[in-house]
Amino acid sequence: MGSSEGQETHVLMVTLPFQGHINPMLKLAKHLSLSSKNLHINLATIESARDLLSTVEKPRYPVDLVFFSDGLPKEDPKAPETLLKSLNKVGAMNLSKIIEEKRYSCIISSPFTPWVPAVAASHNISCAILWIQACGAYSVYYRYYMKTNSFPDLEDLNQTVELPALPLLEVRDLPSFMLPSGGAHFYNLMAEFADCLRYVKWVLVNSFYELESEIIESMADLKPVIPIGPLVSPFLLGDGEEETLDGKNLDFCKSDDCCMEWLDKQARSSVVYISFGSMLETLENQVETIAKALKNRGLPFLWVIRPKEKAQNVAVLQEMVKEGQGVVLEWSPQEKILSHEAISCFVTHCGWNSTMETVVAGVPVVAYPSWTDQPIDARLLVDVFGIGVRMRNDSVDGELKVEEVERCIEAVTEGPAAVDIRRRAAELKRVARLALAPGGSSTRNLDLFISDITIA
């Protein structure tokens, strides 16, 4: 279904109510709206998120929020396994009620709601997936679940994995959702994602061709991907703020902008920025180790540790903050921080949204991944993009060591490789901006996608 010129085209986006899932959808909605004034976009998520989304500070995005029931009682804690099982049972029926209210030309689904494409097909509506991880991660998942390539025993983390257009991997580098240690519900979720691709017409990816060109080309004869990123705020791309479409993220935790005043007082390329994302709790022993390394080096730091985490109480960290060496935030305006000239490097968990932001900002990374797609993102950052180093736990006791933290920070700021890393980071920053400039690779892909969904 489509719409002729001048008529309004309705698009429905569907995602789970996680910050790292909603923000890429909102950024895509912004690009679509700027490219075509005739698009009307609804963003659907589960009813239990209504209160949460009503309390956060909302950017001005060109979407209307709609909600559907997840089938669970309001007081249910919504553990991932329980939520996914319930949505598999009732999601299709409840989302259909929303679909029947309008004549939608296209549905854009998160990969983590894999039941949605079949719903779209049942209503004779074309469906796209917005893949919110790396093209490299998509390639691994596709080749594994669709059995197009051979994989070793995934119980043995030391086994090597050889795949087209990727560096030689070990099993430990693969996304944790496909590993036995990741749990059956996550493994099955990705199997359902691979299966749902038969109902999907477009796989849109939050990346850009110049960043993952070989990986993108390697998928061309399988299930092609369409890079339409980087999906970041306009100011990070060097654009002026739009009067009606400002560039703020949707933050479930209130960020502390006071840190920007502190950054303004720091020397150029002097501050280590540390953030391990919104999903996992920071471990006290890791915080103590990293803090000791910063203290030994006398490096100023800006560190995000979520509210009520015990890691905020680590004595050496509190001492350093009291002495003025650094600042600890409960949540941060990350894109603003990464674009500040005082930042020297980013110690990151390597989530894909953070990876895109640091690539566009041109900031070198110390990669310290934990789970999901983070391990393969770390390999890409270090071995493909060439803008950082990998920080590893000790091979004997599995603990992070002070010496390892110091080695990694020195490597991206002062060591012999630092010049090449900074040069490469600056080059990717330039190319990322070009991708979404007029005539850029991602802009052309977005224009073609809009043309597809608006043709009568």
Curated annotation (Swiss-Prot):
InterPro entries for the chain: UDP_glucos_trans, UDP_glycos_trans_CS
One Gene Ontology term of the molecular function aspect: indole-3-acetate beta-glucosyltransferase activity
Pfam families for the chain: UDPGT
Protein residues bound to UDP-alpha-D-glucose: 278, 332-334, 349-357, 371-374
Keywords: Glycosyltransferase, Transferase
Enzyme Commission (EC) number: 2.4.1.-
Statement: the UniProt record of this protein carries the keyword Glycosyltransferase: yes
SUPFAM superfamilies on file: UDP-Glycosyltransferase/glycogen phosphorylase (SSF53756)
KW Glycosyltransferase (keyword) present: yes
UniProt GO BP: regulation of auxin metabolic process
The family this protein is said to belong to: Belongs to the UDP-glycosyltransferase family.
Function: Possesses low quercetin 7-O-glucosyltransferase activity in vitro.
Official protein name in the record: UDP-glycosyltransferase 84B1
Organism name: Arabidopsis thaliana
Lineage, top ranks: Eukaryota, Viridiplantae, Streptophyta, Embryophyta, Tracheophyta
